[in-house]
């Protein structure tokens, strides 16, 4: 790729076709995709109903800008609101969703201090990068946006010591996906919510990777009983088409009037056509129940087959967002699995991150378990011989 900035460490395969969980490279080799395009293709690759919805919209109109009313935006926003008094700002990505959330929080509260957490990841544009609690993401870019502070995740005493009446917002993930697939303790999150209310700070939950069925409910925070002031979506909202959404309680409306924020392509009709069909699918009776049944099946097999291995130190996560912490580096495991036809990711140097489509079959889960076990056993033998 001679004409593209090398901002990504790319795997040496070029994927040209995908259906469901199966993708094919330009040489005709097939793989089970347990990355879902980094938690994007929650309904699998090229789902027929989503493709048909986009195709229909392609024949009508593609783009009008946000200078005009758009019934499709309102329809999708209503589906996202899920029966609650919520308003939506549409954009194109997760980092844009988080930027919008940060702007809204500061404008509504009139305060600047924002608390996030160590090992968090919220994006790579300046505001969301400043919110990200990882020094390696900050390196080389000079002074960050002022006003951000980071505290240890799951440490309520450290958080209690940091939050005060000058805090505009607290931004967090219910599972730190990029940071190592680290779930939050429910009691910790509930106490964070209470302290936010006490101090007049807004609670922002980044659901870019955990939302839209990935962890077993439409939004990950629902499992804990949280009621965030703002939450953010992207990734699975478009199943591969670029769309993001910042979702806020309706009483925040006074801070986001005309001119306060904008996006040329945000809420474009092609992406919205996909999002509407995706949300309708996820809200079908039995859909999430089936996702949870398969996720439980997968987790049980992972624990039964991998916990006994000496090079596996932990299996954690929720739903179809799973982390496997290894005693050794994850990269050799990723490479051998790819060679054998299974695509997964890392989350740090020694954590495997597994993100199958929510539509994965039981047979595909069985095949992935077989490959994971055999490769980890091979790696263990190799390390012992070395």
From Swiss-Prot:
GO terms for molecular function: identical protein binding; N2-acetyl-L-ornithine:2-oxoglutarate 5-aminotransferase activity; pyridoxal phosphate binding. It catalyses: N(2)-acetyl-L-ornithine + 2-oxoglutarate = N-acetyl-L-glutamate 5-semialdehyde + L-glutamate. It comes from the Bacteria. N(2)-acetyl-L-ornithine binds at residues 124, 263. Pathway: Amino-acid biosynthesis; L-arginine biosynthesis; N(2)-acetyl-L-ornithine from L-glutamate: step 4/4. It is found in: Cytoplasm. It is an enzyme of class 2 (transferase). The modification N6-(pyridoxal phosphate)lysine is found at residue 235. Its main location: cytoplasm. Its cofactor is pyridoxal 5'-phosphate. May also have succinyldiaminopimelate aminotransferase activity, thus carrying out the corresponding step in lysine biosynthesis. This is Acetylornithine aminotransferase. It comes from Listeria monocytogenes serovar 1/2a (strain ATCC BAA-679 / EGD-e). The gene is argD.
């Amino acid at each position: 790729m001679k004409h593209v900035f090398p901002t990504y460490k790319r795997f040496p395969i070029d994927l040209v076709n995908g259906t469901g969980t199966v993708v094919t490279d330009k040489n005709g080799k097939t793989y089970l995709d347990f990355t879902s395009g980094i938690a994007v293709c929650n309904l699998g690759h090229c789902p027929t109903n989503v493709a048909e919805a986009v195709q229909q919209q392609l024949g009508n109109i593609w783009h009008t800008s946000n200078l005009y009313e758009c019934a499709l935006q309102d329809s999708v926003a209503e589906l996202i609101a899920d029966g609650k008094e919520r308003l939506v700002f549409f954009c194109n990505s997760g980092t844009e969703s988080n930027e919008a959330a940060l702007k809204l929080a500061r404008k509504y509260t009139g305060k600047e201090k924002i608390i996030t957490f160590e090992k968090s990841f919220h994006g790579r544009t300046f505001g969301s990068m400043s919110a990200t609690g990882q020094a390696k993401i900050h390196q080389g870019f000079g002074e960050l946006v002022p006003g951000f502070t980071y505290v240890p995740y799951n440490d309520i005493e450290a958080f209690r010591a940091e939050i005060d009446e000058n805090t505009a917002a607290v931004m967090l993930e219910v599972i730190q996906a990029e940071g190592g697939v680290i779930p939050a303790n429910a009691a910790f999150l509930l106490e964070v919510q209470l302290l936010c209310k006490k101090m007049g700070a807004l609670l922002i939950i980044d659901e870019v990777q955990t939302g839209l069925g990935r962890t077993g409910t439409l939004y990950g925070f629902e499992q804990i009983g949280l009621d965030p002031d703002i939450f953010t979506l992207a990734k699975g909202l478009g199943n591969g088409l670029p769309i993001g959404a910042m979702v806020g309680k309706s009483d925040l409306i006074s801070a986001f009037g005309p001119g306060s924020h904008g996006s040329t392509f945000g809420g474009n009709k092609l992406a919205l056509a996909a999002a509407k069909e995706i949300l309708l699918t996820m809200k079908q009776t039995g859909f999430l129940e089936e996702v949870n049944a398969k996720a439980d099946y997968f987790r049980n097999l992972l624990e039964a087959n991998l916990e006994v291995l000496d090079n596996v130190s932990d299996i954690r996560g929720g739903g179809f967002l799973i982390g496997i912490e290894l005693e050794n580096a994850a990269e050799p495991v990723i490479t051998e699995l790819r060679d054998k036809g299974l695509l997964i990711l890392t989350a740090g140097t020694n954590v495997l991150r597994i993100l199958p489509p929510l539509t994965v079959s039981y047979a595909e889960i069985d095949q992935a378990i077989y490959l994971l076990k055999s490769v980890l056993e091979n790696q263990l033998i190799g390390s012992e011989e070395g």
